[in-house]
């Protein structure tokens, strides 16, 4: 662990908390939005714990996860579309609470919170299995194909997990309209997967054989 990495992680975490809080509670017009606090808790408490663990046990992996500068223009567009999707989803959820648009039952939101936490556990498992993971599409020096654990089920388990994470977010927030907005995520991530696989086939030794071995990209038995 380095001092620079610590302050970089702390700064991004703090900015994330403030930004998400503003996007949810400002449109809601109040801090008495229970679903908003529930979401903030299940998002940032596990994130903080995971960050501490990675800082001491896998600082290099944490450093890669904090680096989000895409080298490819096309992937930069994908990242921007994802960002717009999140902004719209959070703002609509807040507005929905403020103006009493259709809200999901509390029990459904609690179920969404459980699904979100399960996805977080799976997210941690993917990080444990694949130390080459970064937030940008690239092939790293001495990188090897991972074909065990969740990687033996689908070729992109990180995206599978984030799909569950992101689709459970609006459910936790109790917003049907926000859920409809985040349904655009599979379309966005499908484009990213296509570009990533083209790069991996070209630059990562053994990836073609891995594709033949593991048939599904994102969802078992579907795609």
Label each residue range with its predicted role.
Residues 9, 13-22, 40, 44, ...:
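Alpha-helical transmembrane spans of integral membrane proteins, capturing the lipid-embedded, hydrophobic core
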Residues 22-37:
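Short, hydrophobic transmembrane alpha-helix segments
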């Amino acid at each position: 662990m380095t001092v620079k990495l610590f302050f970089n992680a702390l700064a991004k975490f703090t900015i994330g908390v403030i930004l998400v809080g503003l996007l949810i509670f400002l449109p809601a017009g109040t801090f008495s939005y229970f679903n908003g606090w529930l979401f903030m808790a299940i998002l940032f408490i596990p994130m903080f714990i995971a960050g501490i663990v990675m800082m001491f046990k896998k600082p290099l992996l944490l450093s890669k996860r904090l680096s989000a500068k895409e080298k490819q223009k096309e992937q930069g567009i994908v990242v921007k579309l994802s960002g717009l999707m999140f902004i719209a989803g959070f703002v609509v959820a807040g507005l929905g609470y403020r103006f009493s648009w259709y809200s999901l039952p509390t029990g459904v939101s609690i179920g969404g919170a459980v699904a979100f936490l399960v996805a977080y556990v799976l997210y941690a498992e993917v990080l444990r299995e694949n130390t080459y993971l970064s937030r940008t599409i690239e092939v790293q020096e001495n990188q090897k194909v991972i074909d065990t654990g969740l990687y033996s089920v689908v070729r992109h388990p990180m995206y599978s997990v984030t799909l569950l994470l992101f689709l459970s977010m609006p459910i936790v927030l109790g917003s049907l309209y926000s859920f409809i907005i985040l349904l655009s995520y599979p379309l966005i991530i499908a484009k990213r997967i296509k570009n990533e696989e083209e790069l991996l086939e070209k630059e990562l030794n053994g990836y073609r054989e891995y594709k033949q071995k593991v048939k599904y990209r994102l969802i078992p038995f579907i795609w």
